[in-house]
Curated annotation (Swiss-Prot):
Residues noted as binding ATP in the record, renumbered to the chain: Y475, G499, P500, S501, G502, C503, G504, K505, S506, T507, V508, F509, R510
GO MF term set: ABC-type transporter activity; ATP binding; ATP hydrolysis activity
TM region positions: 143-164, 187-210, 260-283, 285-305, 372-390, 406-427
UniProt feature, compositional bias: Polar residues: 93-114
Annotated ABC transporter domain residues: 466-702
Basic and acidic residues composition bias: residue spans: 717-734
Residue sites binding glutathione per the record: R311, T312, T313, F314, R315, N374, S375, G376, Q377, G424
Protein name, per record: Iron-sulfur clusters transporter ATM1, mitochondrial
Residue interval of the organelle targeting sequence: 1-55
Self-association and partners: Homodimer.
Pfam families, alphabetized: ABC_membrane (PF00664), ABC_tran (PF00005)
KW DNA-binding (keyword) present: no
Length: 734
């Protein structure tokens, strides 16, 4: 066997085409393994020790398949590329004085190295707490077992070149007719095969043992982050895009997977193997061999890290184009009807193609910079190998080394080329993973503006009386909604809140439900300040039918049962009948199993509102809010539904609040509160308010009577009759 035929074992060389790499085998046969590399990046190089790990390397980069994570309805003009967030730029709940709260989860500004190092170590420390939990000995046992298998596998891996050396030296003798392979090198060949098999076996066992540890850590962190987001206040969610939040969790969990796989299965093993190789070379062949190896490793690592940091700029550009392309595509698809209605298909395609061009440009830079990285790496490594071969050849000439020793040196160094070949990819992905995890952990560190006080107690309802006492509130400091709002909603009565658009009718519910907290004043339920009771008990006591009905992409049965997850099917059917939607459901092909589509887009607005009414009736809370609950219904369905709702309210004595623009729907309310300019302008019954000719309510009523878009002649006639009755009563009083 010639030295040349065995010295190129497992040498990786960059392929000529992006998306592939070439492996030189002992017989010098070139095999091209094509890997799916995003944008021709080095991600296509597979880590042998990680390939079977369940949480495989995340394929960050430009994957437009991630469109599903962008459920935003608003197009960002300049999507932020992922980059390290600083301490001051990390997403936090803005203070009351802040007028420009941060809405992005990423920042593109550079971070000081010292500060970033502290951040990285704090992230790793948080992650370590999840893979080494205090009260879980089973997980600790698995971690210890995985590390033991790792060390055992690397020790055996270093033994492989020694068996190779012994085989070469054993065969480097005169061959006779009685000579057989088993006589000369049988034991070494068997040991070589056993070492390789056991190395692979230990590696796979390590993957299997550590898999549950990694996946448990990923699940735990993702669950905690998701739970924390659900507990954040309304302001937080309105100021951030849902797609960005879901992608932050997705990237953060993938970052955990990569960090665990790279540190446990790549960084630590590579450092251990380099240390063992340097020690072996120094012990067997002298310090010069060890010095060449150590200098090569340091130079190789330095060059790779510096070049990869330079290439990261292009990756950020590709990610920015990817994010923008995802936003454009999802925005267009969600608004499909609008695109078709205005014949703007070509415009949307052009917008999408613009992002593809930006991505294409960045991808070309990624591919060319990858070629520069691979060339530099190969030059450094080839120079080191040449020097090692020269030292080895001199040793053979001097008689201090055998041919087998030369093979041993060659194999020891070449085994290091496998993990080092992925150093650039590992470093870049490690940096990106730390950034992604930092964003996710920052989400966990955010504090909700509305939360239980330390002394909060459950709400004890007596009748459901609601009182706003000198309440002030503003979404933005320069635009106050309420200045000194005070009113009382009697227990068990039907009360309506009306007023011009923007007067804060829906805000009343948001404050009562503690989506927001008032800046001053008190909101009381049966004399209890809602800030002193638990959020859970408060929100269980209030039901709402919102104007924009939120439905899940599930069947009708689930969407109604969401009001009470423990309700039986029969209770769901009864709620549907009360909401006057049973007949519509029965006419559907799959009845209650019918999917409503994303955000309920597969059913009409009126059907959505009736499902929302059924849902809140199933919840059966003592306090009910109806925010334009019948705005999408026809007159007949609205009349029937309101009759059912009124019968429920009358029979059970519930406190109900109706927010309405169509005043005829609340004319039978026990009390009508009219809001204007942040105050209560008027309040009273329908007849009392109509008896005030210059009043706000009277003006709204008259405007709806004369409005050209107002409903049928029968309704107008009925409203005129009501006005005549009021006028007649006034004459009698005078």
């Amino acid at each position: 066997m010639s030295f040349g035929s065995c010295s190129r074992h497992a040498l990786f060389t960059p392929g000529a085409l992006p998306g592939s790499f070439r492996t030189m085998t002992t017989s010098c046969v070139k095999r091209v393994y094509t890997a799916q590399i995003r944008g021709g990046d080095a991600l296509g190089k597979r880590l042998p020790s990680v390939s079977s790990f369940p949480g495989q390397l995340p394929r960050h980069g430009s994957h437009f398949q991630s469109l599903a994570f962008f459920s935003t309805s608003r197009r960002r003009q300049t999507p932020p590329p992922p980059s390290p967030p600083t301490t001051s730029q990390s997403p936090t709940v803005p203070s009351k004085a802040s007028t420009t709260p941060p809405t992005s989860l990423n920042t593109s500004k550079p971070v000081a190295t010292e500060s970033q190092d502290k951040t990285d170590w704090s992230i790793i420390a948080k992650l370590a707490g999840n893979i080494w939990p205090k009260n879980n000995p089973n997980v600790k046992f698995r971690v210890i077992g995985a590390l033991t298998l790792l060390v055992a596998g690397k020790v055996l891996n270093v033994q492989v070149p020694f068996f190779f050396k012994t085989i070469v030296d054993s065969l480097n003798v005169p061959i006779t007719e009685s000579t057989t392979v088993w006589v000369l090198a049988g034991a070494s060949i068997a040991g070589y095969g056993a070492a390789r098999v056991l190395t692979t076996l230990f590696g796979e066992l390590r993957n299997a043992v550590f898999a549950s540890v990694a996946q448990n850590a990923i699940r735990k962190v993702a669950r905690e982050t998701f739970e924390h987001l659900l507990n954040m206040d309304m302001k937080f969610h309105l100021e951030r895009q849902t797609g960005g939040l879901t992608r932050a969790i997705d990237r953060g969990t993938k970052g955990i997977s990569f960090i665990l796989s790279s540190i446990v299965f790549h960084v630590i093993p590579t450092a251990l193997e380099i240390s063992m190789v340097c020690g072996i070379l120094s012990w067997k062949f002298g310090w010069d061999f060890a010095a060449v190896t150590a200098i090569t490793m340091l130079l190789y690592t330095w060059f790779t890290i510096k070049t990869t940091a330079w290439r990261t700029t292009f990756r950020k550009q590709a990610n920015a184009a990817d994010n923008k392309g995802a936003t454009v595509a999802v925005d267009s698809l969600i608004n499909y009807e609008a695109v078709k209605s205005f014949n703007n298909e070509k415009y949307e395609v052009a917008q999408y193609d613009t992002t593809l061009k930006a991505y294409e440009k960045a991808s070309v830079k990624i591919a060319t910079s990858l070629a520069a990285l691979n060339s530099g790496q190969n030059f450094i490594f080839s120079s080191a190998l040449t020097m090692m071969m020269l030292l080895g050849a001199q040793g053979i000439v001097k008689g201090t080394m055998t041919v087998g020793d030369l093979v041993l040196v060659n194999q020891l160094v070449f085994q290091l080329s496998l993990p080092l070949n992925f150093l650039g990819t590992v470093y870049r992905e490690l940096r990106q993973s730390l950034i992604d995890m930092d964003v996710m952990f920052n989400l966990q560190s955010l504090d909700s503006a509305t939360k239980d006080s330390p002394t909060a107690k459950p709400l004890h309802l007596k009748g459901g009386e609601i009182e706003f006492r000198n309440v002030a509130f503003a979404y933005h400091p320069e635009r106050p909604i309420f200045r000194d709002l005070s009113f009382k909603i009697p227990a068990g009565q039907k009360v309506a809140i009306v007023g011009p658009s923007g007067c804060g009718k829906s805000t009343v519910f948001r404050l009562l439900f503690r989506f927001y907290d008032s800046s001053s004043g008190q909101i009381l339920i049966d004399g209890q300040d809602i800030k002193t009771v638990t959020l859970d008990s408060l929100r269980r006591s209030i039901g709402v039918v919102p104007q924009d009905t939120p439905l899940f992409h599930a069947d009708i049965l689930h969407n109604i049962r969401y009001g009470n997850l423990e309700a039986t099917d029969e209770q769901v059917y009864e709620a549907a009948r009360k909401a006057h939607v049973e007949g519509t459901i029965q006419r559907l092909p799959e009845k209650y199993a019918t999917k409503v589509g994303e955000r309920g887009l597969m059913i009409s607005g009126g059907e959505k509102q009736r499902l929302a009414v059924a849902r809140v009736l199933l919840k059966d809370p003592p306090v009910l809010f109806f925010d334009e609950a019948t705005s999408a219904l026809d007159v007949y369905t609205e009349t029937e539904l309101m009759r059912n709702i009124n019968s429920i309210l009358t029979g059970q004595g519930k406190t109900s609040v109706f927010i309405a623009h169509r005043l005829r729907t609340i004319s039978d309310a026990d009390l009508i509160i009219v809001l204007q300019d942040g105050y209560v302008a008027e309040q009273g019954t329908h007849e009392q308010l109509l008896a005030m000719p210059g009043g706000v309510y009277h003006g709204l009523w008259q405007a709806q009577l004369t409005e050209s878009t107002q409903p049928t002649e029968e309704e107008i006639e009925r409203q005129r009759e009501e006005l005549e009755i009021v006028d007649e009563k006034k004459k009698q009083q005078t």
